[in-house]
A protein has these predicted regions:
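Charged, low-complexity interaction tracts
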Residues: 2-3, 41, 45-160
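N-terminal, Lys/Arg- and Ser/Thr-rich interaction peptides
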Residues: 1-25
């Protein structure tokens, strides 16, 4: 009868078990955050590229943001903590907080999410400037590449 002898199979099985155990928290988490960072950087550059004005309409719709609005968007933009939704690991990019423009209606300052939505989607008095949509679409391939590199790097660490 023939006899087969495998060397290193126990080590390989151990590595696969470690990979499975580290997948959710380590590999997937670092991969998702790597892609989110690339997209977040693109959105930050898009916010910095928004034209600045005094916030008053001249001959039509407002097409600018004020300096406090722009600063509020930059300060309030961020990445949420990772969330597990039925096995799908997600992070969200978004705006939080208030800017320094205080009004009677907004005594704490204008909500950054309100300004971001009105600039991105437009209103009856503001021209549409799709800065978030353009940034997300333009950074999609770079985000996928960053995620692929991060995933490979994390798997390589475990499989050594």
């Amino acid at each position: 009868m023939a006899k087969f002898q495998f060397e290193g199979i126990d080590t390989y099985i151990k590595q696969l078990n470690e990979l499975q155990a580290a997948t959710k928290a380590g590999v997937v988490g670092k991969t998702v955050y790597a892609g989110a960072e690339v997209v977040a950087d693109a959105v930050r550059r898009a916010i910095q590229a928004l034209p600045v004005g005094d916030g008053r309409a001249r001959d039509g719709l407002i097409s600018t943001v004020t300096l406090p609005q722009k600063a509020g968007l930059l300060d309030g933009f961020g990445i949420s903590p990772m969330d597990d939704e039925d096995g799908f690991m997600n992070v969200k990019l978004g705006f939080d907080g208030y800017n320094a423009t205080r009004t009677k209606k907004y005594p704490r300052g204008q909500p950054n999410v309100l300004i971001a939505r009105s600039v991105n989607s437009g209103t009856t008095f503001r021209k549409k400037t799709k800065f978030v949509d353009k940034a997300v679409n333009s950074s999609k391939k770079a985000a996928e590449a960053a995620m692929d590199a991060a995933c490979s790097r994390e798997i390589e660490k475990i499989m050594k």
